[in-house]
Amino acid sequence: MLPGLRRLLQGPASACLLLTLLALPPVTPSCPMLCTCYSSPPTVSCQANNFSSVPLSLPPSTQRLFLQNNLIRSLRPGTFGPNLLTLWLFSNNLSTIYPGTFRHLQALEELDLGDNRHLRSLEPDTFQGLERLQSLHLYRCQLSSLPGNIFRGLVSLQYLYLQENSLLHLQDDLFADLANLSHLFLHGNRLRLLTEHVFRGLGSLDRLLLHGNRLQGVHRAAFHGLSRLTILYLFNNSLASLPGEALADLPALEFLRLNANPWACDCRARPLWAWFQRARVSSSDVTCATPPERQGRDLRTLRDTDFQACPPPTPTRPGSRARGNSSSNHLYGVAEAGAPPADPSTLYRDLPAEDSRGRQGGDAPTEDDYWGGYGGEDQRGEQTCPGAACQAPADSRGPVLSAGLRTPLLCLLLLAPHHL
């Protein structure tokens, strides 16, 4: 031992050193290599590091974990700690999520698995146990189907992003447990039909986006129970007709977009036309594609005399649902047998401002008002450092000495020159 150091450990200096050792904070898990960690709230940020797997030895106290823009291929049980509130894994190479991966993340509120182009299927129990999950992002993957109970038990879910997948069909009661869901994004898929009970259970739904699919038919009861829906997008599909009863089930509807569909303005259009005569909504144009003499006209501006040659409409009791011997064409409002199917249209992305017709009344909310808080997923997946995730939280501190360390270390600094 150096003579100077021996003198430092004797007398008053030894007491000072003891105070210093007692004031040292307990040892905590280190931050994973190439990651950045913050203490308040406990955050680990590891985005854009070309990781092929989730880093080992994540601090168990982590509440926010950002792993987006890496090369992670699979997720296994035991990888994540139970204190996680936010988990971002978008823009990776995920192809497999093993059963039980998220089972013990009972505090998790946001899970982003979007923009994983190799994620083609999910196990039925993938999200089991996530009872506090509020936001689930599965956009821009390659999902062609979803298990019937994939969302079972997600009773707190409010935002569900399923856009830009390859979904061909949605099972009845797929969303039955999502009583608190307010936003459902299904645009940019390959859906062809909306069945009778596909949206059953979504009593809190406010916004439903179905544009850019291949829809040819909507069951007359498909929207039954969506009493709070204010925004419905059905543009850029292959709809030639739409049952008026389907829209009559939407008493809170504010904004409706039906443009870029091959609308048939013959007798099949009368239920939809009749609904428009009663409804007060902000709507896009509904341009007629057939018959030739009405091509280019707006379905909403047709007159009662345009339907004089049509058979009288079948009366329907309020709240009744057609069943039994009714033809599926009538239930879905599609063309009768023998009519040529409409070609699926390409994804319609950017509507012109004049596409919406304003409601009556100067104080009515605009569509932009409703979308003010919506963060587009298209831009999010391209960010390498989204929002505050890449910055230290406002209340976090850098390498600043705690109050318990300042006095002992100051004592050592003052004594050291006299003993060395």
Swiss-Prot record:
Subcellular location: Cell membrane; Cell projection, Dendrite; Perikaryon; Cell projection, Axon
GO cellular component, one term: axon
Positions of LRR repeats: 61-82, 83-104, 107-129, 132-153, 156-177, 180-201, 204-225, 228-249
Residues where lipid is bound covalently (GPI-anchor amidated cysteine): C390
Pfam families (UniProt xref): LRR_8 (PF13855)
InterPro entries linked to this entry: Cys-rich_flank_reg_C, Leu-rich_rpt, Leu-rich_rpt_typical-subtyp, LRR_dom_sf, LRR_TM_domain-containing
Summary of the tissues where the protein is detected: Detected in adult brain, in neocortex, hippocampus, striatum and dorsal root ganglion neurons, and in retina (at protein level). In brain, detected in cerebral cortex and hippocampus. Weak or no expression detected in the cerebellum, thalamus or striatum.
A GO biological-process term: corpus callosum development
Membrane topology: Lipid-anchor; GPI-anchor
Entries under SUPFAM superfamilies matching the protein: L domain-like
The organism's place on the tree of life at top rank: Eukaryota
Location of the LRRNT domain: 31-60
UniProt KW keywords: Cell membrane, Cell projection, Disulfide bond, Glycoprotein, GPI-anchor, Leucine-rich repeat, Lipoprotein, Membrane, Receptor, Repeat, Signal
Residue ranges, annotated region (Disordered): 286-390
Subunit structure: Interaction with MAG is controversial, and may be indirect. Interacts with MAG. Does not interact with OMG and RTN4.
Function: Cell surface receptor that plays a functionally redundant role in the inhibition of neurite outgrowth mediated by MAG. Plays a functionally redundant role in postnatal brain development. Contributes to normal axon migration across the brain midline and normal formation of the corpus callosum. Does not seem to play a significant role in regulating axon regeneration in the adult central nervous system. Protects motoneurons against apoptosis; protection against apoptosis is probably mediated by MAG.
Name under which the protein is recorded: Reticulon-4 receptor-like 2
Source organism of the structure: Rattus norvegicus (Rat)
